[in-house]
């Protein structure tokens, strides 16, 4: 069996918030993270030196619960934030303000660190015009307030294209907003879905399709798509025995460096062949969905390929001709692909699926961080696996069999405090050793910690 993964504390993000922190969102391209705090602020930290760069204030009247960076932005960063005050804020900031290289957004240029706290006037220019311009360009601009929810906003998520923003709330609703991208920060409400029977805890967009997943206090996961200009539910997954706290998607094949599951005692060429076959089979279903719950489990879900649902005499599977009108309607069948090894004694609040390594991280109320790895099950291992309590295999029928193995655990990662969120981020401190990625955990005591992984 492959060596276990050691989780090592690299640094805290300093200074921490003095109140509970809920979530830390890594920037998609820059070495930055945005941390949501109960003190009504969003704190932007550098992953280069682990220090505070900006404190975004003044937009929300209650705790900031969630945040997400808009993808595919050039020269400007856009951050969506959701608050217990029932509103969603959109913030903008130029990535560079007259500096070259990676000095923008507070990144160091040589040994010089550029101050970026919006509460401090940065007027270091030689003239008044220059100072005013730099101060204006440095600051986060509160672009627009999206108002529609009746209660606390729990999660926000941008679609892969960056044109759609999904928000969900304690009011049991999911809203989808379209960024009109007209230069005036205008957003249009395109859908309001209210099928959930309880507080909607999380929303997460498919990595390439306009398909939205949501998890709720009603113990279900629901999938949503647009059909003929109307958004509607296409699947309802009833597998968890408690509140679904968080969702994350598996990465696309083009993302990161992950080739697929690993295998023990197999040559590189044999492993490559297995991975190629596995990717070919997986392409029929698309990326899988990861969930965690109050029932203390972490689960993986797989969409049943449309071909297997379309078995009628005129289906594309029998005629070879793609059908524009789907004979089975818009409904999708999602099935449980795996239940990961039980690693938590209390509710699991967050999961994160690495797009670079394929590792899964989970955390929650027990203050523990757990790591899981997916591995191929060889013929020689199948008999042994039946009695292996540390591994749980997928139920994927005719496809290559895999198992998820618990490979790393960090107990008491934030002392006695509950951990609310965990995320993968690209390592940026440029120090040798360790993996290319770090884990970022966010806890009740206001601390945010960065962890490295070694085998």
From Swiss-Prot:
Please list where the region (Disordered) is annotated: 103-136, 302-326
Compositionally skewed regions (Polar residues) per UniProt:
116-125, 307-321
Q: Which InterPro entries match?
A: CIAO1/Cia1 (IPR028608), G-protein_beta_WD-40_rep (IPR020472), WD40/YVTN_repeat-like_dom_sf (IPR015943), WD40_repeat_dom_sf (IPR036322), WD40_rpt (IPR001680)
Give the record's keywords alphabetically.
Answer: Repeat, WD repeat
Give a single Pfam family match: WD40
Task: State the Gene Ontology BP annotations.
Answer: iron-sulfur cluster assembly
Keyword match Mitochondrion: no
Give the CC-aspect GO terms.
cytosolic [4Fe-4S] assembly targeting complex
Q: Which PANTHER family match?
A: CYTOSOLIC IRON-SULFUR PROTEIN ASSEMBLY PROTEIN CIAO1-RELATED, WD40 PROTEIN CIAO1
Similarity remark: Belongs to the WD repeat CIA1 family.
What is this protein identified as? Probable cytosolic iron-sulfur protein assembly protein 1
């Amino acid at each position: 069996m492959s060596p276990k993964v050691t989780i090592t504390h690299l640094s805290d993000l300093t200074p921490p918030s003095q109140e509970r922190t809920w979530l830390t969102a890594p920037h998609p391209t820059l070495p930055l993270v945005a941390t949501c705090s109960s003190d009504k602020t969003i704190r932007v930290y550098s992953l280069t030196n682990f220090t505070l760069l900006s404190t975004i204030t003044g937009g929300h009247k209650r705790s900031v619960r969630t945040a997400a960076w808009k993808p595919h932005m050039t020269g400007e960063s856009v951050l969506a934030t959701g608050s217990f005050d029932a509103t969603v804020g959109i913030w903008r900031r130029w990535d560079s303000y007259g500096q070259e290289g990676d000095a923008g957004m507070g990144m160091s240029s040589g040994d010089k660190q550029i101050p970026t706290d919006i509460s401090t006037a940065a007027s270091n220019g030689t003239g008044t015009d220059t100072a005013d311009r730099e101060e204006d360009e440095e600051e986060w601009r509160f672009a627009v307030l999206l108002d529609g929810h009746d209660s606390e906003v729990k999660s926000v998520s941008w679609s892969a294209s960056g044109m759609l923003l999904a928000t969900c709330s304690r009011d049991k609703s999911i809203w989808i907003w379209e960024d009109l991208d007209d230069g005036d920060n205008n957003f249009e409400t395109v859908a309001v879905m209210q099928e959930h029977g309880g507080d909607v805890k999380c929303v997460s967009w498919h990595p390439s399709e306009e398909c939205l997943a949501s998890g709720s206090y009603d113990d279900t996961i629901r999938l949503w798509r647009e059909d003929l200009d109307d958004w509607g539910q296409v699947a309802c997954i009833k597998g968890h025995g408690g509140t679904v706290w968080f969702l994350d998607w598996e990465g696309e094949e083009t993302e990161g460096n992950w080739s697929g599951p690993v295998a023990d005692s197999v040559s590189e060429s044999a492993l490559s062949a297995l991975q190629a076959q596995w990717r070919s089979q997986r392409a029929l279903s698309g990326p899988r969905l990861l969930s965690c719950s109050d029932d203390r489990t972490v689960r993986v879900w797989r969409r049943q390929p449309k071909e297997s649902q379309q078995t009628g005499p005129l289906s594309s599977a029998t005629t070879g001709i793609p059908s524009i009108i789907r004979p089975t309607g818009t409904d999708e069948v999602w099935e449980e692909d795996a239940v990961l090894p039980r690693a938590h004694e209390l509710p699991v609040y967050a999961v994160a699926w690495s797009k670079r390594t394929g590792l899964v991280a989970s955390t929650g109320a027990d203050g523990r961080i757990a790591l899981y790895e997916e591995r191929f099950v060889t013929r020689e291992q199948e008999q042994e696996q039946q009695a292996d309590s540390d591994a749980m295999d997928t139920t994927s029928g005719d496809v290559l069999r895999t198992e998820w193995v618990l490979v790393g655990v960090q107990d008491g990662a934030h002392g006695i405090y509950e951990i609310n969120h965990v995320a993968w981020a690209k390592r940026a401190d440029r120090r040798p050793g360790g993996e290319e990625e770090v884990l970022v955990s966010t806890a009740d005591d206001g601390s945010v910690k960065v962890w490295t992984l070694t085998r």
